[in-house]
Amino acid sequence: MQKKVLILKHVNCCSIILFFFASFAFAAQELKVGFIQGRGNDAQVEEQAFKNAKIEFEVLDKGNYKIDTLLKYDVIAVGVVAYDKNEPLKENFKVVNEYVEKGGYLVTVDFQQDSTWNKNFLPHPLELLDPDLDDNVGVILADHDIFKKPNALTDKHFGGGWGAGDFMADGPHEAPKPWKPLITDKQNKWPLVVWAKAGKGDVVFNSLQILQSLGRTGKKEVSEVLHNFLFWRGPRTVDAKGKLATTWSVLKMH
């Protein structure tokens, strides 16, 4: 009898865990993703990357750069060299930074061109140089939630299999305060991904070629990286005292 009880407890526990992670994944895509497209040549690759990751998004066009419109999104993702090729973004980057200051989350999900980079494009100054790295260089991950949810990421996610020339390009050589390095390569100690708070929001500058790699290889580990880079933070705001309208809100409260 005792053995049966233990088995039932084990089954119930497993069911709860499976339900939690299923709910967590569902809640993550409840988040509204705004996407700023990059260069035209990579548009299909970018679209394929989101398709491979089963992530829904809305493209931000030139008429969308109004603070009330941007604040409807939980996260705004920036595509391949968008700060070089996307004219509406270059003309309205200050509005995007205001979105961050007011509680939004901005993340570059592919590399940005160093030669046309303005160090003031983001809420905090950041200089870019022209280092390029192939995959499997070896990386060090910081202790940060971006590697913990919705997937548990390890250095193996950033190892081999990203594709020829599709790992990292045009990143900073240092992370001046308030930037903090999230991913550092072992050989050069370059901060490949950096993060900072800005007002009520967060900004992540990433020089890994996530969209290009995922769009071309469909690699599961890169898909999990994209999920985490977009969804680790959760919703832009959660009114804990008000009505819990989303699964994510319920999870946050428990």
Task: Give the ranges of each region predicted by the language model.
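Bacterial N-terminal signal peptides
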Residues: 12-23
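A short, well-structured beta->alpha microelement
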Residues: 52-69
